[in-house]
């Protein structure tokens, strides 16, 4: 989801039978690299494959499905804890054995940038001259740290963080599957807190859904758990700035501290609001276009706030 720059060419290669012996999946943490590597293993070893659409019914697909028992021919290695020369030699030796029951013997190496220089050199020969039945999938957040002689043998697919519209679609499908009502104002908070990482964002949503009440997941329930500044407090701060009410602004900061809020978080959220107003001045339909993460029912309020300032005023306040 949201990784078309990877899925489109990779699907075409699988369907055409253009299989390489080493792949490199890179990108920020939590963006789906390792999960995609597992899906690719299913695609490669499906009885009807290699295919971009594994059947999900054959023994290989069932064993590699989420919650499945696993497959002897697909090995996952966490290079953060198994990165030494002996670990790589063992992996290299195993690579020369033919698959027990599948088309390919696949090695998924997570955190591949953590492999030690001596370990990488031990692995190099089998990556350079692999048996026909072996495929390596390296996953890493720092591809530049993988030695060039290995990196040059791979097909490199860069993953990226999800955009807010794509993330909202993912959250809405998850919520629909759970059957829990979630207020529209909750989504922007969860999306921002997740930082574009599907894994982190879904983890936050799962935590919030676990504590949902009879009315579902409301803004008032989610906001304190996420540590986000209340929108009404930000609205008051914007009104104070627009009216150039300096005493009122100092009184508001005192209120933030006395109420137990994090002053640093208040400052960050206020800067984010000023940034949103600057975008709305430049692009009136920014909320609908997904440039500003806010519920659609807040569009008129934010637009009115943006109109109370000139462009230079917002720039000055944000600086």
Protein language model annotation of sequence segments:
Residues 59, 63-70, 87-90, 103, ...:
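Extended, largely alpha-helical regulatory/partner-binding modules appended to the mid-to-C-terminal parts
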């Amino acid at each position: 989801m949201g990784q078309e720059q990877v899925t489109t060419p990779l699907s075409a290669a699988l369907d055409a039978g253009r299989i390489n012996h080493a792949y490199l999946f890179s990108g920020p943490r939590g963006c789906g690299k390792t999960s995609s590597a597992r899906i690719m293993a299913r695609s490669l070893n499906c009885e009807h494959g290699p295919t971009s659409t594994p059947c999900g019914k054959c023994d290989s697909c069932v064993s590699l499905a989420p919650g499945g028992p696993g497959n002897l021919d697909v090995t996952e290695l966490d290079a953060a804890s198994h990165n030494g020369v002996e670990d790589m030699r063992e992996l290299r030796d195993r690579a020369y054995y033919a698959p027990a029951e599948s088309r390919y013997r696949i090695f998924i190496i997570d955190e591949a940038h953590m492999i030690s220089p001596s370990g990488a050199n031990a692995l190099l020969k089998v990556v350079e001259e692999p048996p026909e039945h072996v495929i390596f999938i390296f996953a890493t957040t720092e591809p530049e740290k993988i030695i060039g002689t290995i990196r040059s043998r791979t097909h490199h697919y860069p993953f990226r963080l999800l955009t807010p519209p794509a993330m909202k679609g993912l959250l809405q499908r998850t919520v629909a599957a759970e059957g829990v009502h979630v207020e529209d104002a909750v989504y922007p908070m969860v999306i921002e807190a997740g930082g574009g990482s599907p894994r982190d964002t879904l983890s936050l949503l799962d935590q919030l859904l676990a504590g949902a009440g009879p009315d579902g997941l409301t803004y008032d329930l989610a906001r304190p758990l996420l540590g986000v500044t209340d929108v009404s407090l930000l609205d008051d701060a914007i009104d104070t700035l627009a009216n150039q009410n300096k005493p009122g602004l100092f009184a508001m900061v005192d209120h933030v501290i006395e109420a137990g809020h994090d002053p640093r978080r208040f400052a960050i959220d206020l800067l984010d609001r000023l940034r949103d107003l600057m975008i709305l001045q430049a692009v009136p339909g920014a909320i609908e276009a997904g440039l500003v993460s806010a519920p659609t029912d807040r569009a008129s309020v934010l637009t009115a706030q943006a109109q109370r300032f000139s462009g230079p005023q917002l720039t000055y306040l944000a600086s």
